[in-house]
Structures are given as structure tokens and as C-alpha cells.
A protein has these predicted regions:
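Short hydrophobic alpha-helices and adjacent helix-cap/hinge residues
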Residues: 4-6, 29-31, 35, 59-65, ...
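N-terminal signal peptide c-region/cleavage motif recognized by signal peptidases
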Residues: 24-28
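Beta->alpha turn/N-cap motifs
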Residues: 97-102, 162, 172, 192, ...
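Hinge/capping helix and adjacent helix->loop/strand transition within the periplasmic-binding protein
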Residues: 87-93, 108-194, 243, 256-289
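Bacterial N-terminal signal peptides that target proteins for export
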Residues: 3-16
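A ligand-binding cleft/hinge motif common to bilobed small-molecule-binding domains
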Residues: 102-111, 170, 177-179, 206-240, ...
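An extracytoplasmic/periplasmic, membrane-proximal ligand-sensing/linker region
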Residues: 34-36, 178-182, 219, 245, ...
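N-terminal (or domain-start) structured segment
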Residues: 29-118, 157, 165, 181-210, ...
Length: 328
């Protein structure tokens, strides 16, 4: 266990102690104190993180009786928007919805203007977004063991695509390389769309990607999904095995979106938000909307999310470090 993980755990214990203290105090009961509320999404409009955030904003606004406005502040892989929230007042008026990229920043960027744990108050994990191991239908493999054997039988001739260097799909493939004991060329693209196009055309032989981008192609028979990266099978592709079931017992990764507030936001406000979302996000209507973008609802407690973020930072950081992926 690394010294960074131990330091993160010490900060986590302090944060959880604050959450429990304020929760016991009963402060901020009743009306939510901020109106309107800005929900910052550090990516352009229309993407899966943005769509999930807008669903959360709508439900949160209705539950709290306030206006929740989504603002897209993209740049530097999401760090521009995250930095805005890190610098905001912890009064409930500014929130952040970010993907698992939030905990990858320290591993792939040499300079990060905030601490991904200590500069924020964790509120809840909103959703998980399973990644699928995809191959073109023309590739003569039907499962993960056959893919591994194909790679070994064709040294230097198998390449994997990603939506960009350092993202969750890229690092998922790097973990696959390590666990399977194979070497594959990385071909990064500017987004999932061109990568999936080349994958379907056979220009690259495999790709890990979120179901947000790839589910429609799998269901249309244009791509084969050999496995999902989550510990359990996905309800969206129930017949597709997990990586563990497919023969890699140590492999488990989840892409996810979470909700944060600036550091120091009182725990009763945090709990008010979490409870409001928990009451709405598991309804059949919201689940259907999330499934349409390849996501599954979670809504964890602030304490559980705080622990989850620490372990995810360690997990993704280790994968990034092993792969040598950097962006500046």
C-alpha cells in the first residue's frame, strides 16, 4: 500500500468525522439555502456526463424546490471545470459532476491546480458506466481466451483503439495487457466516434469503450462485445460475461460519474442532496433514461463515496503509472 494511499486515508477519516459531526448537529434542516444552484460539468454539452448531470439537476431541483442550472466548463481534460468548483464557496450554490477521470488527473498530468480529494466534499456516486471489450465482427474470435491467443499468434499486428490518451478506456486496455500478458499497440483517437468507425472497419482489432458510445453497435450486430469490465454482469448486456468470468480473475474496473461540492460544505447540505437524489434515481423512469446512455444508477452515501474515491484514485493511479500514460 503506497504512502499516497495512506495519506489519502488519513484525510478521508478527517472528512468523515466532519460529516458525522455536522449530521449529528441537525444544522441546515429544512429549506435548501442556495437558489439557483450551478452544477458544473467539465466537458462539452451532449456527452454522457452532461446527460447524466442534467438528469440529476432536474431531479435535484424538483426535490429541493430550487433551480439547478448545468454549466459546461470544458478544458484540460476536465480540470478547468473542476478547478472552478474547488475555488468556489462551500455554500451549496456550486456543485461538480465529473467522471472517473477526476481521480486519474494526478497520475497523468504533471501539474494539477487542486487536490482531487482534499479540495472537494464528496456527495455521492451518481452512476456506474460499464466498459465493454469490443472487437470487429470480422475478427475470428468469440471470447476473451480466443482473443488473447489471437494476439499471441499475431505478434506486433494487433492494435487497440481508445477515445484518447489517459482516459478510462485507454487505461482499461493497459490493465488488460498486464493481466493477459500480451503486448498491443495503442492507437489513440480524438473521441469514441472515429475510433469505433475504424474498429468496425477492422483498421484496429480491439477497443475498450463505454456502453454509452458502443451499445447501439453491439445490439445492431456491428461489433462483438466479449466481456464487460464491471465485477457483475451489466443489465444492459446480460449475456456478456465479466472479465473475471472470461478468464481474468483479477480484472475489475468501473467507469463512473460522481457529484462533489467545494471543500468544507456542511454535511447536512451534503446529506440533503444525496437523499433527494436517492429518492429519485432508482425509479424505472430514471433507470430507463440512464440505460439509454449506457449508465446504471448508484447513489451512494457521502461516506461511502469518500472511501470509494480514495480507493479509485489508488487503483487508476497504479494502472496509469504502470502504463506510463502522461498528458503534460
Amino acid at each position: 500500500m503506497s504512502q499516497y494511499f495512506n495519506a489519502d486515508m488519513r484525510r478521508l477519516r478527517r472528512a468523515c468525522a466532519g460529516i458525522l459531526f455536522f449530521a449529528a448537529s441537525g444544522a441546515w434542516a429544512g429549506q435548501y439555502p442556495a437558489n439557483p444552484v450551478r452544477m458544473i460539468v467539465p466537458y462539452p454539452p451532449g456527452g454522457p456526463t452532461d446527460i447524466a448531470a442534467r438528469l440529476a439537476a432536474d431531479e435535484l431541483g424538483r426535490s429541493l424546490g430550487v433551480s439547478v442550472v448545468v454549466e459546461n466548463k470544458s478544458g484540460a481534460g476536465g480540470m478547468v471545470g473542476a478547478d472552478m468548483v474547488a475555488r468556489a464557496r462551500p455554500d451549496g450554490a456550486t456543485l461538480l459532476v465529473n467522471a472517473s477521470a477526476h481521480v486519474i488527473y494526478p497520475a497523468i498530468f504533471k501539474q494539477v491546480s487542486f487536490d482531487v480529494i482534499d479540495s472537494f466534499t464528496p456527495v455521492t456516486q451518481l452512476v456506474q458506466v460499464p466498459l465493454a471489450l469490443l472487437v470487429p465482427v470480422s475478427l475470428p474470435v468469440n471470447n476473451v481466451p480466443e482473443l488473447i491467443q489471437y494476439i499471441k499468434d499475431h505478434p506486433g499486428k494487433v492494435a487497440f483503439a481508445s477515445a484518447g490518451n489517459g482516459g478510462a478506456p485507454h487505461l482499461a486496455a493497459e490493465l488488460f495487457k498486464k493481466e493477459a500478458g500480451v503486448d498491443i499497440l495503442h492507437v489513440p483517437y480524438k473521441g469514441s466516434a472515429p475510433a469505433l468507425t475504424d474498429l468496425m472497419g477492422g483498421q484496429v482489432q480491439m477497443m475498450f469503450d463505454s456502453m454509452t458510445s458502443s451499445l447501439a453497435y453491439v445490439k445492431a450486430g456491428k461489433l462483438n462485445a466479449l466481456a464487460v469490465t464491471t465485477p457483475e454482469r451489466s443489465s444492459m448486456l446480460p449475456d456478456v460475461p465479466t472479465m473475471k468470468e472470461a478468464g481474468l480473475p483479477s480484472y475489475a474496473l468501473t467507469n463512473w460519474y460522481g457529484l462533489w461540492a467545494p471543500k468544507g460544505m456542511p454535511a447536512p447540505l451534503v446529506k440533503q442532496i444525496e437523499q433527494a437524489l436517492n429518492a429519485k434515481f432508482h425509479t424505472p423512469e430514471i433507470r430507463e433514461k440512464l440505460n439509454a446512455i449506457g449508465a446504471e444508477p448508484v447513489i451512494s452515501s457521502p461516506e461511502d463515496f469518500a472511501r470509494f474515491v480514495v480507493t479509485e484514485k489508488e487503483r487508476w493511479g497504479r494502472i496509469a503509472q504502470d502504463s506510463g500514460a502522461t498528458l503534460n
